[in-house]
Each structure stands twice: as structure tokens, then as C-alpha cells.
């Protein structure tokens, strides 16, 4: 008979991050006179604000802290342009090889490109340009096995030490933005319920205004310090020459 194998498992306590919006004032006069539903618009904007903050913190959390064998952080290697080296397909190939070497699951690999790197590939890689968008699915096509996404608020790294800049910090002159790669199967996320805080105008006789805000809890983290990678824009000094 085959030997029976036990799978060790258990619960782990995780503290979720809190996200909340400041109350927005909507007067009864506005609701009466405006031609659109301002309350619905305000609610939508609050939801968008919370989502933007959650996504920003999540991409930072699942980006490697620094370069290591298990979490490779590499520099772009293309031509110099506007103080940095552009991203090329070769950079993605290099990261793919490192993921393969680390036995990162091939299924579902994601690469989130910062805006500079998207522009680099669109302007300089005809193949990427041609297969960038799938009109039928409405999605960006895969590149070298990676599901491709775009995000403007990708984290920054020190271009020399390849260490990640702390979340919320203002990037220094030594810091450059990165594109982030990861395996979703090695990440975790948890979302709490959304709570609405609202006071109606009928309960505010002196101001006759409605107030509304929201609060929720969420977190996104790597399960282990592995299956993550980053491609950081290499910094080019003025003496190296800027050819574009």
C-alpha cells in the first residue's frame, strides 16, 4: 500500500488594513436643483477612492522587498531615454528565466507594467504592439507566459541597492519605478465588509444636509517571501548620454 501523507495546515491570524473616506456633504437644495443624482455620484466616487487605495497598497505589498534568489529584482537593459534605460522584451525573458529556475508556477503568472514600461514596449517592440490588445476578449494578450496588466502606481526601488521604497514615501532622485511580477497562487487576500456611515438631512434641521462616508478592511500579502519579482528602470546619469 502507498504511504499515507498528512497535510499540515492551520489558521493564521492576519490584521487587515483599514480604509475609510471622509464624509461628503450633500444638501437637500442640491438634490432638488441638480439634474443628476448627486448622491449616487458621491457614493461611486467614495468606492473608487477606496479601491484605488487598496490596489496601491496591494501591489506594493506583493512586490519584493529587495533582490534575492527567491525574489529577483532586475534592471532594465534597453537604450537610454530621459534619464533611464527603457524596458525591452529581453528584460521580461530574463525575469521569466529566473521564475522558471525558482519553479514559480507557470499557470497564471502576472506582470503588472508601470506606465513607462508600457510605453517602452509599445514604442520599441512591434510584436508587443501588434498583440497588445485582444479586441475579442477586451484584454491585453499574454507575453512570454505572463498575464499582462497596467498600473500607474507601481512601487519604486532604489536603482542602486534594488531595495523597495517604503509605502507612502516620496521617491528620491535615486529611486525608479518598477513593473511587478508574481504568481497569484502564492499570494493571499482578504476583504472585510463595507460599512456605510450616513446621516440624512431630515435629521439635521439646522443644516438640512446629508453626510455620507464609507469604511472597509482589506489586505493582500505574499504567503511566503517567494514567487515575486520586479523589473526596475535602470537610472542613466547625464554623463552616459541621453540619446532620445
Model features per residue range: what roles?
Residues 68-139:
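Extended, solvent-exposed, turn-rich assembly/linker loops in the middle of proteins
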Residues 58, 91-94, 207, 227:
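Exposed alpha-helical structural elements
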Residues 1-4, 46:
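Short, polar loop/linker segments at the starts of domains and inter-domain junctions
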Residues 28-30, 38, 56, 60, ...:
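General "foldedness" signal
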Residues 9-71, 100-115, 148, 197-198, ...:
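Long, contiguous amphipathic alpha-helices that act as assembly "spine/axial" helices in icosahedral shell
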Residues 3, 7-16, 80-87, 124-244:
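Sequence/fold signature of self-assembling virion shell proteins
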Amino acid at each position: 500500500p502507498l504511504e499515507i501523507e498528512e497535510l499540515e495546515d492551520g489558521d493564521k491570524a492576519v490584521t487587515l488594513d483599514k480604509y475609510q473616506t471622509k464624509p461628503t456633504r450633500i444638501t437637500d437644495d442640491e438634490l432638488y436643483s441638480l439634474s443628476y443624482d448627486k448622491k449616487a455620484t458621491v457614493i461611486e466616487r467614495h468606492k473608487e477612492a477606496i479601491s484605488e487605495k487598496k490596489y496601491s497598497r496591494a501591489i506594493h505589498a506583493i512586490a519584493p522587498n529587495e533582490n534575492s534568489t527567491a525574489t529577483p529584482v532586475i534592471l532594465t537593459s534597453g537604450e537610454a531615454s530621459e534619464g533611464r534605460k527603457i524596458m525591452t522584451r529581453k528584460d521580461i525573458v530574463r525575469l521569466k528565466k529566473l521564475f522558471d529556475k525558482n519553479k514559480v508556477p507557470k499557470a497564471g503568472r502576472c506582470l503588472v507594467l508601470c506606465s513607462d514600461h508600457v510605453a517602452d514596449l509599445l514604442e520599441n517592440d512591434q510584436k508587443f504592439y501588434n498583440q497588445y490588445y485582444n479586441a475579442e476578449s477586451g484584454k491585453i494578450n499574454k507575453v512570454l507566459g505572463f498575464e499582462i496588466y497596467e498600473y500607474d502606481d507601481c512601487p519604486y526601488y532604489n536603482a542602486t541597492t534594488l531595495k523597495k521604497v517604503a509605502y507612502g514615501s516620496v521617491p528620491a532622485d535615486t529611486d525608479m519605478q518598477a513593473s511587478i511580477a508574481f504568481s497569484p497562487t502564492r499570494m493571499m487576500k482578504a476583504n472585510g465588509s463595507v460599512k456605510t456611515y450616513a446621516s440624512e438631512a431630515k435629521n439635521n434641521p439646522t443644516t438640512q444636509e446629508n453626510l455620507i462616508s464609507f469604511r472597509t478592511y482589506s489586505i493582500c500579502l505574499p504567503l511566503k517571501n517567494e514567487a515575486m519579482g520586479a523589473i526596475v528602470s535602470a537610472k542613466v546619469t547625464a554623463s552616459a548620454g541621453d540619446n532620445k
